[in-house]
Each structure stands twice: as C-alpha cells, then as structure tokens.
UniProtKB/Swiss-Prot annotation:
GO terms for molecular function: G protein-coupled receptor binding. Belongs to the AVIT (prokineticin) family. Pfam families: Prokineticin. The gene is Prok2. This is Prokineticin-2. The keyword Disulfide bond applies. The lineage of its organism: Eukaryota, Metazoa, Chordata, Craniata, Vertebrata. Disulfide bonds join C33-C45, C39-C57, C44-C85, C67-C93, C87-C103. Keywords: Biological rhythms, Disulfide bond, Neuropeptide, Secreted, Signal. It comes from Rattus norvegicus.
Amino acid sequence: MEDPRCAPLLLLLLLPLLLTPPAGDAAVITGACDKDSQCGGGMCCAVSIWVKSIRICTPMGQVGDSCHPLTRKVPFWGRRMHHTCPCLPGLACLRTSFNRFICLARK
C-alpha cells in the first residue's frame, strides 16, 4: 500500500463506512400512538399515509376535509384502518361525488 495511486482507492472503499451512522440510530416519529386515548382533544389515532404499519395522532375532519364513511367515532377502542379521522362533532361524512366524501354540516 505504499503506492500513492492506492490512496484514492482506499479512500473510496472506506468512505461508506465513514458516512454510515452507527447502528442504533433511528428515526423519531412524533405523534405516534396505538389508540385514540393517547392523542389530544380533536384528534384520533389513524394510520399513517406514508407508513401503513404506523399510527399517528391526526386531527379530526373539519368542514371541507376528505373523510371515509366507515371511520369509527372517537374514542374508538380498536385499531383504526383508515388514515383519516371522523369528522368533528356536528359534521357528517357525506358523499359529494361517486368516490368522494367530505365533512359537511349536518342538516
């Protein structure tokens, strides 16, 4: 390894080891939950849009927000299967077109 041409090759081989974080570092997900009771008022524990195996505290639907008609009321003691929470009290999840539901004032 005394050949000066080997230095760039050695650096290239060692660079991934130098840039890799130590094992044990992990992403911290804020707002992670297992059930509604772990979330604050006006929120529910819904499936993450990005990682389906994770549930996060999500705001309940306001007027005009997309919703799912089968989303259970808060608090729900089981595990939610949708990424949306139910609409806020006084609102209903109503169909606006073939495959679209939004939170609207109850009549």
